[in-house]
Amino acid sequence: MTVDRTVLIGRPLRAATYTVSEIDVNDFLGVVAEPDFAPADGSEGGAEAASGRLAPPSFAPFVAVLGLLKTFDWQEDFLFDYRTGTAMFGEQAIEFHRPLLVGESVAISAAISDVYEKQGKQTFDVIEVTFDIKSREEGDLLMSGQQSYNLFK
């Protein structure tokens, strides 16, 4: 059965939240070289002292990916059964508006902006999702962008 996913264009996805935790940032810094950022070691006041410190800029795409995964259901929103199908992340573009802070809670809003078919060794649909990520407290825009998902037929 062929699925026409173009009917999804314009569909808003679920709102989601993510908190930039010290644990996630420290785990991230354990595998990514960020010379100007060091994992917090728990001294100098522990989590309270770490809260409010800048997260490394390279952590922002991680927040975008994790946050976006909370905004959709593969079957309901993409008409795709991930248990029997193959999906891959595609391109990602992010515009940064201000740094993320450790301890900050963010709100993610997203919508399906485009769907089109491509042909490689296999035919697949590309679903493009645009998103905004804002501070939950102040509501200021932290980052905006686009993420695509490749759904193989």
Task: List where the protein language model places each region.
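Hot-dog-fold acyl-thioester-processing enzymes
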Residues: 1-91
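HotDog/MaoC-like acyl-thioester-processing domains
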Residues: 1-3, 96-153
